[in-house]
């Protein structure tokens, strides 16, 4: 299973791990998403502001998601893609709860590796993983990707065909940081599209939230080893 997903990512820039977690586990994660999400301002398609429940830098605020962030199956995939160098390993760059609601402005196509000033060659600097809490469909704003674009050195062309990634709750989407992608637009006022996001980088790169994801040294020193090793 893991080798097949790594091959998907190598060939297409993204891979899907079907049924990464069962429904009972996802129901627990759904409750945790409600617990840790707060209202944040986002922009609607019409330019007006909207308050959306989401969360940023989860790993610095709670231990409730550590089992996912450090899941051995996920780490095995990430290490195959990021090819860690020596003692540097891989590090958590960002974690959060994504929530695509009706009317939310869809972001532009982008590459996560563009956080850094030079595009990676051979292996990416980063890998993003999205755990579907709700179903991903076109009408609720499923993530859109341009297959194979992780091999490009050029920018994406607006005419390029993007594919919506359809997921069931519990499925895991893993994306090479060089892949051009964006969240879709949710046109269903009665549904949301939530996902727990974890974004890893090569250990020698600067993480998005800085060393230890911004945690004070005292808090960091008390972390369980299963998550501490990735911070």
Predicted regions and their residues:
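Non-heme Fe(II)/2-oxoglutarate
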Residues: 47, 179, 184-231
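A structural signal for short, well-ordered beta-strand segments
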Residues: 94-97, 129-131, 196-200
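Short Ser/Thr-interspersed hydrophobic loop/turn segments at strand-loop and sheet-helix junctions
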Residues: 98, 135-136, 178-179
